[in-house]
A protein has these predicted regions:
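Membrane interface segments of multi-pass transport proteins and intramembrane proteases
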Residues: 53-67, 85, 137-146, 172
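Short Lys/Arg-rich amphipathic alpha-helical segments
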Residues: 35-47, 51-54, 61-65, 69, ...
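Hydrophobic alpha-helical transmembrane segments
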Residues: 41-45, 60-67, 93, 115, ...
Length: 173
């Protein structure tokens, strides 16, 4: 995925149906993915605005919402890629919303949702999302459509979440 959106074809919202406009607006992270440089980082940072929601919902309800967000994201990301005619365009950041949210789930479980841990989670997720160790790289290269767009970020979120658990249990206790 290209991190520079300056040379991508423009997204013409005014030429879309209201439904396509709504789905693409969600797909580009309510506009956060339209940043000219590093849209994935901006989308991941925007996802941190969900932290109060996860705190309010608690662990069980947050898991349900994040699973639904991920399942709906398969359609949103796939449809957005089809409408703008670019597969896994860097401006599509709904997948970052899901991956970043998955990363933060251990903080709810551990009751450690504070800004230091949230920033650690943000950094870990971005490292895995950019670095793409196996099986993230496999999902990124071999799985197509909306599932492919979502899957690499879901796996990156799981890797980052695992790192948070390891840091907490083996380094801090």
């Amino acid at each position: 995925m290209d991190t520079n959106t300056l040379h991508k074809p423009p997204i013409h919202f005014n030429q879309m149906t209201w439904f396509d406009r709504f789905i693409v607006f969600c797909g580009v992270g309510f506009g956060s993915g339209l940043a000219p440089k590093a849209p994935g980082t901006f989308g991941s940072a925007f996802a941190l605005l969900f932290v109060p929601l996860w705190l309010y919902l608690g662990l069980s309800a947050s898991i349900v919402v994040i699973v639904l967000m991920s399942l709906i994201g398969i359609y949103i990301c796939g449809h957005t890629a089809k409408v703008i005619n670019v597969h896994d365009d860097g401006r599509i950041v709904w997948d970052e919303f899901a991956g970043q949210s998955i990363t933060l789930l251990p903080l709810l479980y551990l009751q450690q949702m504070n800004w230091l841990w949230v920033i650690v989670g943000f950094i870990l997720f971005r490292i895995f999302d950019v670095w793409k160790p196996f099986p993230i790289s496999w999902a990124d290269q071999k799985v197509s459509g909306g599932l492919g767009i979502m899957l690499d970020d879901i796996i990156a979120g799981l890797w980052a979440a695992l790192c948070i658990l390891i840091f907490h249990f083996y380094l801090l206790t």
